[in-house]
């Protein structure tokens, strides 16, 4: 057998092994991952031909297709327009761009478009160690790709949130073109309403990165940033909003100021950063959103009561799907995440607000997300069982390899994906009966 054939066989075997490992044998607590329903998986199989097609073109100020540059687009255009209209109805806005392929791409287009319109290269954001996504930071997309000057908001470590008074002073002094809220470590709603007036006073646009909490927003279980004053919401479609990998941008076209910005963002999407639109990746309900938050809060309470330093105890630990846990006492984030991985409990190491943001390799904390286990049907009592398994690993009471068998056994009890439809037919029947 030649080397090419060996590599191909290894590739196929690794794909099968991954499916068994992560889908059947692990409990996934990565906060940035989601779980697709059977109906969504069926929809992806239904539209396989879309993956082979190009559909570049311009959109209008409602986010619908304006002009195509390729032929054979009549049904692709219907699909894109329907998807855009569904997004606008779900989030109660009058403009969206669904062509971006990730949350980071949504940030790229929004930051680029607005900075071009304002001719202002300054952006004020939360510090990286306090939860900001790498794409907001001077070390990431905003600084290294777009060349923006990054200025940090003030952060209250006790409240685990942005300090409104000090941040208002920073915004007034900096006079940026962009102020970005939202985060990658995102436990509590950010002060959108509280900062809106000062952002307007300096002529800036307020962007809210809702990648982690989009499904919670859709389900009414978190803040509603557009209603609170955000000019743009950027997001990904595969975290608490449990669809395939993708991105979107939301806004309301209300005046000439917003029209200029939307046109700038659309230009940054196409032609600046997108050629083809990957429609094959396009897709939460209220019950799912609320149960996800309840599960996260239950885990926070249980772990805290058993001696683990869970951040945010005075505020109920979290109002999102996430928990932040200080594990320095047990060897730090890198060690604990690795130990839990050996037990088939998948989490990630994470900087905490008081960490040196250059210490990403071994931060103080780990981040947990409960959207995946909630989708599988975990309730509060199941979460406590899971926490017991985590505690036995974190505190070194049992070897991870021993705990692994219990984790696999627990995972096998939850084989049905909840809060969704089992087929396209079931979804269509439900919608027909509801109307």
Language model features: what each stretch is:
Residues 294, 298, 359-435:
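PLP-dependent enzyme catalytic core of the Aspartate aminotransferase-like
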Residues 284, 289, 293-338, 346-362, ...:
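Conserved small-domain helix->loop->beta segment predominantly found in fold-type I
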Residues 75-78, 82-309, 327, 370-371:
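Conserved PLP-enzyme active-site core in the AAT-like
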Residues 1-82, 197, 419-435:
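N-terminal glycine-rich, Lys/His-bearing helix-loop that initiates the first secondary-structure elements
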Residues 343-347, 394:
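A common structural junction motif
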Residues 229-231, 344-345, 364-366:
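Glycine-enriched alpha-helix->loop->beta-strand junction motifs that scaffold or abut catalytic
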């Amino acid at each position: 057998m030649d080397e090419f054939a060996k590599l191909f066989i290894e590739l196929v075997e690794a794909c099968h092994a991954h499916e068994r490992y992560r889908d059947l044998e692990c409990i996934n607590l990565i906060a940035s991952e989601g779980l697709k329903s059977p109906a969504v998986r069926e929809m992806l199989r239904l539209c396989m031909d879309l993956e082979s097609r190009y559909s570049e073109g311009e959109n209008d100020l409602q986010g619908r297709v304006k002009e195509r540059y390729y032929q054979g687009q009549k049904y692709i255009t219907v699909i894109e327009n329907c998807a855009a209209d569904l997004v606008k109805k779900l989030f109660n806005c009058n403009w969206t761009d669904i062509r971006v392929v990730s949350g980071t791409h949504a940030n790229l287009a929004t930051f680029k478009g607005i900075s071009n319109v304002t001719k202002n290269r300054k952006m004020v954001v939360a510090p990286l160690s306090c939860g900001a996504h790498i794409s907001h930071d001077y070390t990431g997309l905003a600084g290294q790709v777009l060349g923006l000057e990054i200025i940090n908001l003030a952060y209250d470590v006790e409240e685990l949130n942005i300090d409104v008074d000090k941040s208002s002073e920073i915004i007034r002094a900096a006079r940026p073109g962009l102020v970005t809220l939202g985060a990658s470590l995102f436990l509590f709603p950010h002060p959108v309403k509280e900062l809106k007036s000062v952002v307007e006073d300096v002529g800036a646009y307020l962007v809210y990165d809702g990648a982690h909490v989009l499904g919670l927003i859709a389900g009414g279980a978190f803040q509603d940033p557009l209603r609170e004053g955000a000019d743009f919401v950027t997001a990904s479609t595969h975290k608490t909003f449990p669809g395939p990998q993708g991105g979107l941008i939301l806004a309301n076209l209300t005046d000439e100021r917003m029209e200029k910005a939307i046109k700038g963002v659309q230009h940054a999407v196409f032609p600046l950063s997108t050629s083809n639109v990957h429609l094959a990746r396009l897709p939460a309900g209220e019950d799912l959103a609320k149960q996800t938050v309840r599960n996260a809060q239950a885990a926070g309470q249980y772990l805290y009561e058993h001696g683990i330093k869970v951040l945010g105890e005075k505020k109920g630990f979290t109002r999102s799907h996430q928990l932040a846990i200080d594990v320095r006492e047990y060897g730090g984030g890198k060690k604990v995440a690795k130990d839990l991985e050996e037990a088939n409990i998948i989490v990630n190491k994470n900087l905490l607000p008081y960490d040196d943001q250059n210490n990403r390799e071994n931060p103080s904390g780990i981040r947990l997300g409960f959207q995946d286990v909630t989708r599988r049907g975990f309730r509060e009592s199941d979460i406590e069982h899971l926490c017991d398994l985590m505690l036995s690993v974190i505190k070194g009471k049992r070897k991870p390899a021993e705990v692994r068998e219990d984790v696999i056994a627990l995972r096998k009890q939850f084989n049905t994906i909840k809060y969704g439809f089992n087929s396209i037919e079931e979804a269509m029947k439900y919608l027909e009966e509801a109307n």
